[in-house]
Amino acid sequence: MNKLALYCRPGFEKELAAEISEKAAELGIFGFARVEENQGYVIFECYQTDDADRLAREIPFNQLIFARQMIVVSDLLTDLPVQDRISPIIQQYQAIAHQINLTYSTELLVETADTNEAKSLSAFCRKFTVPLRQALKKQGWLQGTRHHKQGLTLHILMLDSTQCYVGYSYNYNHSEHFMGIPRLKFPLDAPSRSTLKLEEAILTFLSREEEKKRLNEQMYAVDLGACPGGWTYQLVKRGLFVYAVDHGKMAASLHDTGRIEHCAEDGFKFQPPKRSKIDWLVCDMVEQPSRISQLILKWLVNGWCHETIFNLKLPMKKRYLEVKKCLQMIEESLEKQGFRYHIQAKHLYHDREEITVHIAVKSLD
């Protein structure tokens, strides 16, 4: 298997192709990306047979911005017999069983791309999963427990009922979610659907233990461009006191909590109140990404906060280039100022033409 399949939001295939090509080249691995617009995935074909497996192990998945999932895959299986789709799939796994330990594989996911056309296969995928799982277990595979981090997850990427890619991902270096998509329910008392963006960001960037330590009732936050309160809602729910900065009105339900102070000011001019030590800054303002990046830097460099989650709205063209430029500017500025920091960026499921960035400033040298 010399290919990687990487899932993404339809329309962002070119950005993902550029990103995976760059990350592979940094490891001295070369190949080419097969890209079809709006198909919801990219196939990166390596020139050397074992290189796809190496990429799946050595490129930290959490450093990929546009990828929802990363799996090593076979050549495309076509013309699967309607009466026996399982045997060709088993044969693909048998061909790699001497190299990859499939015994302690933990889970089987029969998936599609995140497109309307592909989703029409979802009922088929559910039905097909049961007999395929049984057949894999008969081979002595899928014997691991689900949370076995050193194990593998087996993936079947169905293009239609007769075509699929057969593959696997490493449990320590993949998305644990089906199709790479977290299933979040919209809270009925939240002021806007944007609340799901911050919830997904917190779940993506922080472990459960980190969330409890770093987002709690002893902390203060500032939400720039807060109206009507979708992001503020997530912070208040976790017990933080929030300075909600926006000329627009905040939802009455948030005022009723007693955990917010509405500051009717411009988010670019607002400065934190001296009486409070601000732990978190969040920002979902619609503005040029370079301007938002400069704003976030101002807060971090001035010591006004030590952790932040913010969105960068992307231009119509050269989106990956713009992302790289903004993140590089932030990193270089923090390093120049002597900061130690941790930065992550992700094109979340609930993001559209934007990415979400998390930065934690650890300390000053």
Swiss-Prot record:
It catalyses: cytidine(2498) in 23S rRNA + S-adenosyl-L-methionine = 2'-O-methylcytidine(2498) in 23S rRNA + S-adenosyl-L-homocysteine + H(+). InterPro entries: RlmM_FDX (IPR040739), RlmM_THUMP-like (IPR048646), RNA_MeTrfase_FtsJ_dom (IPR002877), rRNA_MeTrfase_M (IPR011224), SAM-dependent_MTases_sf (IPR029063). It comes from the Bacteria. The keyword Phosphoprotein does not apply. The keyword S-adenosyl-L-methionine applies. One of its GO terms (biological process) is methylation. S-adenosyl-L-methionine binds at S194, C227, P228, G229, G230, D246, D266, D284. Keywords: Cytoplasm, Methyltransferase, rRNA processing, S-adenosyl-L-methionine, Transferase. Belongs to the class I-like SAM-binding methyltransferase superfamily. RNA methyltransferase RlmE family. RlmM subfamily. Monomer. This is Ribosomal RNA large subunit methyltransferase M. It comes from Pasteurella multocida (strain Pm70). The lineage of its organism: Bacteria, Pseudomonadati, Pseudomonadota, Gammaproteobacteria, Pasteurellales.
